[in-house]
């Protein structure tokens, strides 16, 4: 369909593989046309020794487990400086353990099931991998008892793993977040950038550290010291939303002045009476 010249423009949200297939087909058209693509992420959060850990833990939990971790902006990896790593892990485990999982139409439940059996099996496989090669700090189980056994319900999971483990690189799209210790903010940023993706990235730390983080991080959407966690455009009428690298292109913010011009055609008019 995208190869048809009658298609004036395309906005895509989905996997990198499908997105790149679409972009290539679209580029082979008879003339250039606007194309916006959002194609996944492996979103990182950096926590410095100067961070407000309560705020950081709250933001990470909201970002990692909101909508069952099945949103493009979800945090899935955390790099924390060693002096505060133990305290942050304890807070994350505590807050994660308080999450109520169940029927998402009921107000008492904050998290519902994962999308389908494929995601459910991927979760179980990843949790088993972490039990063997890392550590489970909270969760790590499929919820099979009682009425939850009739759906694809899993526990929100906080885990640790060696920094070279494959789960730090692979997009999971699950309620699963890894936490790793680093020696410095600089090392954390290097690890955050060592990914094919670059959609969202968060930072919790001191005011003086913020410019350094924002200058070096490779992500299209950034947030700093935000207790609500990752944003899909906190102010969508004013902020562009989109990624770098394999995460796609910036500019996806419906209704904003960053978005609309990409689907407008300029015409210069000179009229002489």
Locations of the language-model features?
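Conserved C-terminal structural/oligomerization subdomain of aldehyde/semialdehyde dehydrogenase
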Residues: 6-7, 11, 46, 58, ...
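ALDH superfamily catalytic-core signature
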Residues: 5, 9, 17-163, 186, ...
């Amino acid at each position: 369909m995208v190869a048809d010249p009658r298609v004036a423009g395309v906005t895509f949200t989905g996997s990198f593989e499908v997105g790149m297939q679409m972009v290539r087909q679209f580029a082979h058209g008879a003339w250039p046309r606007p194309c916006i693509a959002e194609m996944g992420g492996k979103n990182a959060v950096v926590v410095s020794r100067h961070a407000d850990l309560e705020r950081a833990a709250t933001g990470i939990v909201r970002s990692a487990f909101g909508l069952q971790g099945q949103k493009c902006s979800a945090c899935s990896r955390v790099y924390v400086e060693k002096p505060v790593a133990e305290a942050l892990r304890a807070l994350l485990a505590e807050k994660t353990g308080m999450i109520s999982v169940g029927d998402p139409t009921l107000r008492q439940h904050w998290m519902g099931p994962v999308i389908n059996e494929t995601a459910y099996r991927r979760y179980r496989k990843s949790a088993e991998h972490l039990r063997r090669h890392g550590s489970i700090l909270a969760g790590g189980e499929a919820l099979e008892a009682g009425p939850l056994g009739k759906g694809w319900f899993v526990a929100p999971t906080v885990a640790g793993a060696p920094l070279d483990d494959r789960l730090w690189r692979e997009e999971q799209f699950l309620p699963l977040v890894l936490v790793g210790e680093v020696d410095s903010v600089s090392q954390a940023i290097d690890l955050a950038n060592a990914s094919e993706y670059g959609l969202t990235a968060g930072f919790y730390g001191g005011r003086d550290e913020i410019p350094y983080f924002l200058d070096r991080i490779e992500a299209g959407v950034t947030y700093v010291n935000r207790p609500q966690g990752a944003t899909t455009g906190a102010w969508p009428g004013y902020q562009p939303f989109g990624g770098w690298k394999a995460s796609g292109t910036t500019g996806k913010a419906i209704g904003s002045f960053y978005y609309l011009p990409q689907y407008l055609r300029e015409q210069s008019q000179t009229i002489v009476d």
